């Protein structure tokens, strides 16, 4: 019982870190949101996929050039160490930290909100340049947390419309929604989520029946983003 209690407390703590992080990323500018990379990752064909456990796999290693989105700044980088991952489980991965260690040093990657069958391109947290995957023999997924209840878009109550840098949130429930409505979104194109980061934007104070509220979503773009889940009271 003590072990289970400890695991629940750790999961809550990790989740708190996630939501604090995505809250900070909400305040970045629209200009940064529009600087999506047009350079596809260069995958090293010599590497094999890695089973990290619980249905999470590294499916590729390689280098990435383009906008560095992991810290929300979206400045341009060249030749950064990247990995591609896939969730083959039946649950959405809420958060996890992938660590690769070995003779080449330590490479760190973070991932959040990866749904079943979802694929993501993750960039090394310290912007390490990629040379080879051979020097990273130990590969682990740490602090993994899966959603206990699968997240939804609250589609029976909320309708979401997107513009570059903005989101339109409509109450379609026919009743007043008390409390905040929070929209979580990620970079997405060509079948991949780009970056482990999840952004959020919130409607504060609830919504009247039929009310439409436009909110700032600095990293959202019509062509390069997708809403992954919504929380509503």
Where are these predicted regions, by residue range?
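Short, solvent-exposed loop/turn segments enriched in Ser/Thr/Gly
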Residues: 75-82, 161-167, 213
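Ordered, small/hydrophobic-rich secondary-structure cores
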Residues: 38-102
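Sec-dependent signal peptide cleavage junction
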Residues: 24-41
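N-terminal Sec-pathway targeting helices
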Residues: 2-18
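Terminal connector regions
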Residues: 37-58, 124-165, 209, 217-233
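Asparagine-centered strand-capping/turn motif at beta-strand->loop junctions
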Residues: 84-92, 168-175, 187
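Intrinsically disordered, low-complexity Pro/Gly/Ser/Thr-rich segments with frequent PxxP/GP/PP motifs
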Residues: 105-131, 192-221
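Short, hydrophobic/aromatic beta-strand segments
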Residues: 91-99, 178-182, 196
């Amino acid at each position: 019982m003590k072990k289970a209690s400890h695991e629940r407390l750790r999961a809550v703590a990790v989740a708190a870190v996630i939501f604090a992080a995505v809250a900070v990323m909400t305040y970045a500018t629209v200009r940064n949101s529009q600087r999506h990379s047009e350079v596809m990752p260069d995958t090293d064909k010599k590497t094999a996929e890695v089973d990290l456990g619980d249905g999470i796999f590294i499916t590729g290693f390689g280098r990435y050039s383009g906008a560095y989105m992991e810290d929300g700044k979206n400045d341009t980088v060249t030749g950064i160490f990247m990995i591609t991952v896939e969730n083959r489980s039946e649950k959405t991965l809420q958060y996890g930290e992938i660590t690769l260690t070995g003779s080449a040093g330590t490479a760190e990657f973070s991932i959040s909100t990866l749904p079943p069958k979802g694929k993501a391109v993750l960039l090394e947290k310290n912007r390490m340049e990629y040379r080879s995957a051979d020097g990273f023999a130990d590969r682990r997924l740490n602090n993994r947390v899966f959603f206990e209840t699968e997240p939804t878009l609250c589609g029976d109550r909320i309708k979401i419309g997107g513009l570059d840098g903005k989101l339109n949130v409509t109450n379609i429930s026919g009743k007043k929604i008390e409390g905040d409505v929070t929209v979580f979104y990620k970079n997405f194109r060509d079948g991949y989520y780009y970056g482990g980061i999840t952004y959020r934007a919130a409607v504060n104070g609830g919504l009247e029946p039929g009310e439409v509220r436009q909110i700032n979503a600095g990293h959202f773009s019509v062509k390069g983003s997708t809403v992954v889940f919504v929380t509503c009271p």
